[in-house]
Amino acid sequence: MVSTKGRLVVDPEYLDLLAQSNCVVQVSMVCSKYDPLEPGTPPYEERLKIVETLAGRVQRVIVRIQPYMPEVFKDVMANIPRLAAAGVYGVVVEGMKFYKAKKGMVKIGGDHCYPLNVLRPHFEAIKAECHRHGLKFYAGENRLRAMGDSMTCCGIDGLEGFKGNEYNLCMLMNGQNPEPTELMKQIGTGGCFQSLNQIAGINKKINNQSFYGLMQEELGGKLDYYKKMFGLDE
């Protein structure tokens, strides 16, 4: 998996290497209106040419419409047939997250986000237009993840040689009932939880538990919090 907004991926030496690999390439590109916000990066139209070059050489090209803002809805919709013509496999869409509070936003965890009643109709329209042109649609927005053609939103779904980690809170909260791997059940596999629990003595507790056990504990103790995070409280 390669994710970029740069032009280096189509330099011959790197393009040849990607062509020899079982590789999905993601390119971040929303629309031309974002060009002034990203000085030093290729403008949208150049990225479209980059995508077209990549599409014939790699397993899949995924366009990341991230971060999405409702103000560019018409631009995004108008570009979907162009993405299909360029050989794109699918798009992943996620709403903009703001650090500071803004009027009309809702606070989700540490972010200020667009409310679902704003994002949902946009996502539904974008999804329908993608399908009309033969593109896959993925929702990078946690609260709308289940809208996607796969809840593994990076674009690797069904591709030989790739297997996503389905045992995550997003899957569990959306009723997918994924099974943990045997390794996840082994004691001492929950190290990633140390970053979520930075309190004295927590390392000893985590080291004596499994990833699976800590996931169940996390879900059971913060159910209302995660319902809000994954848009299931409305």
Locations of regions flagged by a protein language model:
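Conserved AdoMet/S-adenosylmethionine-binding subsite of the radical SAM
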Residues: 1-122, 129
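C-terminal accessory extensions appended to soluble enzyme cores
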Residues: 103-234
